[in-house]
Every structure is written in structure tokens, then in C-alpha cells.
Amino acid sequence: MVLDGLDREAVIAAVQAAAPEVVVHQMTALAGLRSLRNPDKAFAATNELRTRGTDNLLAAATRAGTRRVIAQGYAGAGPDKPSGGRLKTEADPLDWRPIRSAVQMSAAITYVDKTVPLEAPEGIVLRYGGLYGPGVSDVLLEAVRKRQVPVIGGGTGVGSFIEITDAAAATITAVGRGAPGIYDVVDSDPARVAEWLPYLAQVAGAKPPLRVPAWLGRILAGEFVVAQMTTSRGYSNEKARKELGWEPRYPSWREGFRAWVRG
């Protein structure tokens, strides 16, 4: 069945007809995304699905008597001036001051984090790290091969990745296991941009990425991309591994990147 996730009555009717034991919310509109200069513009449709779409699915689950609702979250969109250590956990505050061009995107991500565990009797948010794999991040790979993704400002920002089939496995596990709440679904090897980007270029058989200062990066790519490359924080998967009993097939992006690019 194909329907509009923003059509409340259609969503409610479809879920009631299916009468599922679990509702899994994976609605996004990210296909073809290429530029993050203005995240609020790039993610406008996805922001709607994360807010109105989430409300529609929660209402549908209530009407259908479905207690367990699992929603896709995101571990990666951080503040412009993050505090604390190198790694974040589910216990860290959800509220932070976002980049000016990403206010709506950040609010939509936070909305899912707060609303699903609160409104659903068994509400779970799986905050995926940076997804990669065949058909998921091919745009990035193409850009890296063309040397269109530079290391900005020293590449000191820390990222957490998750291979697409590992994310799917965690989601399947959460269908039957795990207390309500938030889980960070990332691999076990958070890494600085200055580590993972040159490695991806090497695996892809490309020349090393260019390096540009932060001021030039702001002109070329925008403030959000500069923040991601210089001040972002990684995430810990300890809770997901312990409470869901989930283990990533690719505990490091290094082996995952190799399998993705060469497979």
C-alpha cells in the first residue's frame, strides 16, 4: 500500500485495516538530497513527516490498539557550540541551540525524540547514526571520488556511522525487545572527519580530499556543514547493545566502508 503520510485520515484507515502489533515509522523524503547549505530547506518535507507524520501514525496506532511504536530518529544533528565530552549518550539533554539554518530540522528531530516515548505506551526512538551502504550514500561516494567533499577546518568534528543493514537489524530487534525510550543505533567506532573522509577516498580509489579553512568552508558549503566537520560529537551504542541485545555486523566504519565500496 502506498499513501501520503501527511494524510491523517488515510494513515489512520490504513493502520486500522492492518491492525498491526507494532508500528514502525520510517517516513522520510531524503531521496536525491545533495546540498546541506540550508538544512531547513533541504529537509522541509522530512520535517513535516517527522512532526505531522509522526502525529498521524501515533493517532493511527491508538485507534488500532497498537501499543508499540518504533520511530526513526537521528544521532548526528548537534548544536553550534556543543558541550561535554567526545561522545554523547541517550541521557544527554535533547534541548540545544541549533545552527540558524537548521532550526526547523533540529526541532523536528527533537519532536520525534520527545513525542514517541511520551505518547505511545511502548514508544521507542532508534536514533540512527550516519547511514551508509549501497543505494543509501552513493551521492556521497560520487562526490568523494570527484574531490568535491573537502576536510574543513581541520576535520575535528566527530561522527558516528551505521551501515544500513545494521540499522535494519536493530529495528527488527526492537520490534520484540527493549523498554520504551531512546536508543542510539551507531557503530562502535566514532571518528573524526579527518580520519574517515580520507579513508573513504582511499577505499574508493580517489585522490585525498582537499583541505580548506573554516572561513572558506562557510562560503562553499554553509555553516551547518562546517559545524558538522569541526564541532560535532559522536554517540555511544552501549545502551542499544546491552538493552536490545543488538550487535552491529560492522562495528567499525572502516570495514563497513570497504564492504560498501568494493561490494
Can you say where each PLM-predicted feature lies in the sequence?
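Active-site Tyr-X1-5-Lys
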Residues: D55-N56, D95-I124
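Conserved beta-loop-beta element that borders a ligand/cofactor-binding pocket
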Residues: R68, G73-Y74, Y111-P134
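Conserved Rossmann-fold NAD(P)-dependent oxidoreductase catalytic core, especially the SDR/UDP-sugar
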Residues: R34-A102
